[in-house]
Amino acid sequence: MKVPKAPEWVSALSLEQAVQSYVDNGDRIVAVLPSVHLIQFRNCTVLLPIQVKVQQRDSTVRRLSFLLKAQHGNDFQAKIMDHLKMFVREHYVYHKVLPRFEQLFEAVGQKVSFGPRAFKLDRSIGVRYILMENLKAKGYRNVERGKGFDLEYLKQVLRKLAQFHAASAVYVEKRGKFNQLLSSGIYRKANQEILQELNNPEAFLSQLRRWRIGTHFHKQFADKEEVLVEKLLKLHASDPKQFNVLNHCDCWANNVMFKLNNQGNVVDTALLDFQVVKYGSPANDLYYTILSSAEKKIKLAEFDNMVQYYFYHLMDSLKILAYGKALPQLEDIRESLSKHGLAAYVVVTRVLPITLMNQFEDEVNELYASKMKCSMFTNRKYILAMNEILPWMEERSLLNWK
């Protein structure tokens, strides 16, 4: 596959403002070094590591590491991302929302961070972007996506989500509702046609009928898929009577990084990629995180225990932040999970097959899209997982959403 050439703006990057937040007066930038050999292209996005050499007043040289995430390309998928305001939403979260969430904890004596620090370039590069600290340079790592989160990693992720959710609930209590960019996310009537395109079930349904359990589920899924987007829009219309939070909505193995100490224990967890955040029931994030990225052996076996673990930390954070409204009950979360079967269905039919692909397989362009979709649903790991997941969902009445 032909690798796209580096964007033209790479040679004109200026990071003076970003660097100033790290250095003292008298320090000066010696060089800005985009690591073009490490550039990654995926999903109409370019990820570019940038090294900055700073000469300090004592003449020693300090290296700072940033990561630039920018829109790339003008194809159909790029236009969809622009229409759905994915970079606009993520920029707003990094620069406006996360700092305020962290300030809520800071005000009660707790140091909690949710993701990398974000900065602004000195001048426009002609495309939307997110400039952030490079967590890899600080020792953060992803888990192997094919294996997913083991029990300890999963607990760390759920604890971080509980803190994130609690902060969002207190934020709304203190400052009022989120703007429409976050309250509705991508799930707006105006986006129905695009959502229909993105959720085309043809590849999934054509392979489903070939599975051992496929004949049992194919007919009902084919009928349900006809109204899936319509039902999604209704599901994601937030219910003011339920306990609502800002959901990450894309919390899978690739979008979480961990920092370990010398003993191999997690000392910090960072969330990444806030392009599709949305206000609503925490059931959305619980299904997304556990069903997409928990290790196969714990995905279903530990599901209820992990919901309870999440709830414990949610309550802990709500109390720490002095949440003034009625506290949710565990039964409320369970009831919401039972009502969000469609959310679970979308995760296992749209997200799980991607998480089980090899890393290189999702770094493709349009020419490879149809071949990739086919390989997603013929992947033996995915079929084996679904042989367990679909009966589990059926037993819990999570497939009755039509």
Please provide the spans of the model-predicted regions:
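Active-site acidic catalytic loop and adjacent metal/ATP-binding pocket
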Residues: 45-57, 228-282
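Regulatory N- and C-terminal appendages and interdomain linkers associated
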Residues: 1-43, 53-63, 222, 234-237, ...
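Short, flexible loop/turn elements at secondary-structure junctions
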Residues: 36-40, 52-54, 72, 120-125, ...
